[in-house]
Amino acid sequence: MDKKARARAAAAESARRTALRRAAMFTSPGVPRDLLASLPASARAFASGGLAAALSFAAPGGAGWGAPLAAELLDLTRTNMRAVYEAAPGWGGWRDGKKRGELLDSDARYFVARAAGGGGGGGDGGGGGGGGGDGGALLGFAGFRFVSEGERDVLYLYELQLAEAAQRKGLGKHLMALCEQAAREAGMQ
């Protein structure tokens, strides 16, 4: 195979992979695919260690997304990570604007965990925090994207954030398992 033929084959393969990734992410152009919809109902609930959570899917531009949810995700990330960013040499400290941009990226996808039954789930006992969604207080989320790394299409986990009251109860492990299932369903590695 000559150089031009190899380049054409590589371009065709790249286009095929991009189309597969887009099909995994969207039901139609600009409409994010609900990645929980194809999973068993048991995947949308969590109960362990005295913690009960209802899980939902959210993506910028999709159903269930709005400024209140985006603010909640940013608030939880800031609470958990600001000190780490400030202490890490070379990271440039915490910057709300930069993190907000990452969270709002059109390719970002989220599995969101909220206290089941509208209660605080062991947290502050309040409602939805910023009013960002149905149910109770935000307990945590997994933020991810479908990306290409070299010649492999993968689900890349950008954030796994849990409220203090939800830590060490298995919720993070459950969110990771959902990400793995979503990757398999989408044909990713």
Segments and roles (model prediction):
Residues G49, A53-W91:
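Short amphipathic alpha-helix that is part of the acyltransferase structural core
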Residues R168-Q181:
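Conserved acetyl-CoA-binding loop-helix of GNAT-fold acetyltransferases
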Residues A183-Q189:
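Conserved GNAT acetyl-CoA-binding A-motif
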Residues A83-G117, G128-G131:
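Active-site rim helix/loop that mediates acceptor-substrate recognition in acyltransferases
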Residues A115, A142-R152, L160:
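A conserved beta-strand-loop-helix scaffold within acyl/acetyltransferase catalytic domains
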Residues A53, D134-F141, L155:
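Glycine-rich phosphate/pyrophosphate-binding loop shared by adenosine-nucleotide-utilizing enzymes
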Residues L157-R168:
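A short, internal acetyl-CoA/4′-phosphopantetheine-binding micro-motif in the GNAT/acyltransferase core
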Residues A108-V112, F141, V154:
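Short hydrophobic/aromatic beta-strand element in the GNAT-like acyltransferase core
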